[in-house]
Structures are given as C-alpha cells and as structure tokens.
C-alpha cells in the first residue's frame, strides 16, 4: 500500500471507486438486493420486530424510510436499525467468506435510509463498495478476532456501512476519514449473543452506526481522522495492524469482492456453518434412506474450529437451533423440512431432542481440505452408524448457495416469491432489474 495511513487510504479508495464500470459487480449487487429482500420478508413476523417498533414509536421521529414488510415508515436512523434486524432475524440473509459474517443485512439497510433521503442514484455501486470494505476488513482483521468471541457482522459492519453511505452521498476525503473513525468507535458485537434476539440486532446497530457516522461527518462534528491506525487504533485493538497494512487496500476492486469470491445466498434459515452438514445429511437420507428410527448414532466431523459459530449443542427452541448442527441433523432425520417454521421460538419436540443426544461432534486436522472448499479450509462429514450394522457417510466441502455452488438468479427469485405476494414480488423484481431504487423503495414497505 501507499505511505498514507490505513484510514486515509481506505477513504481514498472508497471515494475514487468506480464500481458502476463493472457489469458483473452491478449484476451481483442486483442479485444481492433481491436476496436481501427475500430474507427480510421471510423474517417480517419475527416477534422481536414488534418490540423494536414499540420502542421507536415511543420515541417518535420523522417517518421517512420504509420498514420492510411492516406497512410503516420510520426515521432514518431508526429504520436502519429495524431493517438490519429484520434482514438478519432468521439468519436467512447472505454471508461472505472473507467477512465471516453478514454484509448485506448491515450495508443495505443503511443505504435504504440514505436512498429514501434522496441519495438513490448510486445505491447499487455503494452496495458493491460496502461489500468490498467489509470483506477486506474481515481479511485484514484476522481469524483471531472471531475466535476471541467478536461477531464480525457487528464489529466490521459499521465501518462498511459508513463507507457505503459515504460513497452514495459523495463525501469528501476529510468527511470519509472522520466517518470511518466515528463508525470504528461504535464497532461492537459479541458471539455470546448467538441464539438470542440480540444477535440479529447486531446487524441493525451496525447499520445505524454507519449511517450516524456519515451524518456526524457531514455535520462537521469533531473526531479522529486516523482511527484505523496506530497503537490505539481499530486494527491494533481488534486484530492485526501489520496484516492490515498489507491486505486492506491491495488490488482494490480487482476483482470486486461481491464478484469473487462473491456472496453466499442461503437456502436454509440458519447459520451457514451448519449448511455443509445439512446438505450431507439430506444426501444420506436420499441415497441411504437413513432416519431417526434406523440410526444409532451420528458423528459430525469438522476441521478444528470449523464449528465455532455453532454455539448451541442442546438447544431448547428452534431459535437457538439456528446455531446447532445437532438440531439441524436431528430435524432432518425426523423427516422435517429445514424451513423457517422450525427455527422459531417454539420448543423443540422431545423426539428430536432425544435424537440430538445421539449426535457427536468430532474434530480431525488430518483430513485434507478440498481446494474448492467454502469457506477456505472447511468441510463437514456426516457419518451415520445404522442399527443394521452399516456405516455410511457423506462429505460436503461447498454447500448449495456458496460461491462455486451458487444459487441461480432464478433460485433467488423463487426465494423471493415464496415470501412476498406475487404482484409485489413482480414489482420488486422489475424495479431491481431496472435499477429503479425509488420504485424499489415504494414496494418493500
């Protein structure tokens, strides 16, 4: 990188970006916007939404921005928080392997709030820039950040959202440097909250923080212009400043991270770390006719640390089960679909809980990861020991939806039409195809 600091360098990279020149990047942004909308409408009845709506209605504010799927509007900062929560409520929103978290649930709500205030022309390009920033932050912060217990969606998302909105609203170099700092000082989110309502709120709070950071910078509020740098800066506190100096800005946009490796669009409403196992157990059910009735026990084999996000081993409700490979496998073995209704606050049936007790996690660092694995170095093997003495197993390195095994545009449209009334879905799809953001906003409320 150049001799300028990380904060100044990032601000300059954002300010001078030209993502609109990449047909592929804008195409992927449109797919991402449709998937974001599908995930948001799927989560529109989550009980946490009404709690947050009551909170902001008590506070008041100017209702300018649509709250997705609620038939209401909210003030910009409030909407960013709400829409981030809604998008991430079911863990049905996209992930990015470089981020080790959820970029769109943070970036898009902040951009929707910005667009509703008249900054809609550059939304798709700003989305590309936001994903670029968040992916590079994830790569630069290092794996130890997540392993220590930080939730990257929250800790990296605020800066990414600030950069995305800063690009959309064409901030100056000084304003961007300050906005990055204002976002960095609000960066937070702990994995101890996984399996609770607070976990998806991390996305909402990060979106809100990024939007607030831009508004503060535009208001000439005072703050550091070097918040990513030095011994007390973001990377020194949260990760590895030396690594960041080599990775944060190199080969910016070449290719754009929204294109390569790309967003991972989900077919299941639970943590992506369990998607490998879900595909594997469904394969065994289909090919080997295994079930809860004929399976004595199951081993789920990960590389060390491959299940770090799967914090729940004995969940009591489907909501906690979003982070439990035991629940996902047991649910499938009992013949249930891995669909939204099974990952709510309802208690887990006794039979499923009994089967969960026969599922054991195993870690093996001798197994060679596949070159095409997503995320890099990851795999899951599901090995079933059957009552007739057979042992059968299935290995998945790149689950359905992940880059390299991605969902088609038609798959994403189907995901949207399953959660949105047909006419509304048609209007949303047309608006996104035409990059008509005003029309898009008119139909997501």
UniProtKB/Swiss-Prot annotation:
It comes from the Bacteria. GO terms for molecular function: lyase activity. SUPFAM superfamilies: 2-methylcitrate dehydratase PrpD (SSF103378). InterPro entries: MmgE/PrpD_sf (IPR036148), MmgE/PrpD_sf_1 (IPR042183), MmgE/PrpD_sf_2 (IPR042188), MmgE_PrpD (IPR005656), MmgE_PrpD_C (IPR045337), MmgE_PrpD_N (IPR045336). Pfam families: MmgE_PrpD_C, MmgE_PrpD_N. Belongs to the PrpD family. PANTHER family: 2-METHYLCITRATE DEHYDRATASE (PTHR16943:SF8), 2-METHYLCITRATE DEHYDRATASE-RELATED (PTHR16943). This is Uncharacterized protein YxeQ. It comes from Bacillus subtilis (strain 168). The gene is yxeQ.
